[in-house]
Amino acid sequence: ADGGTHDARIALMKKIGGATGALGAIAKGEKPYDAEIVKASLTTIAETAKAFPDQFNPKDSTDAEVNPKIWDNLDDFKAKAAKLSTDAETALAQLPADQAGVGNTLKTLGGNCGACHQAYRIKKD
């Protein structure tokens, strides 16, 4: 996932989506609480969010798949990704111990996702 390609960005978001989905299944009670899955999912989110801004190269500022607002607000964009990573690391350090804890963690992480997507994601039809 180097070079900041469109495919690399999609692959990273899919990793976060998969990890979030695994946490969501536990939070909703669709899957039993499993500390290893929670740990793995939070680790994936923390590491992937940290790497995500590196996939945006200002030299690719003509890429139609990239919202131009990212270039205008690169520090904010990076800060939003860093907050998601930090919040996932914090959750990892205080590992949610049950379904409710996973749900509360997801609310925090989901807020980070929403804030960045609202500001920077290009809506597809």
UniProtKB/Swiss-Prot annotation:
Binding, heme c: M13, C113, C116, H117
PTM annotation: Binds 1 heme c group covalently per subunit.
Gene3D superfamilies membership: Cytochrome c/b562
Binding site for heme: M13, C113, C116, H117
Cellular component, GO annotation: periplasmic space
GO molecular function terms attached to this record: electron transfer activity; heme binding; iron ion binding
A Pfam family reported for this protein in Swiss-Prot or TrEMBL: Cytochrom_C_2
InterPro entries: Cyt_c/b562, Cyt_c_II, Cyt_c_prime, Cyt_c_prime_subgr
Assembly behavior: Monomer.
Function: Low-spin monoheme cytochrome c.
The protein, known as: Cytochrome c-556
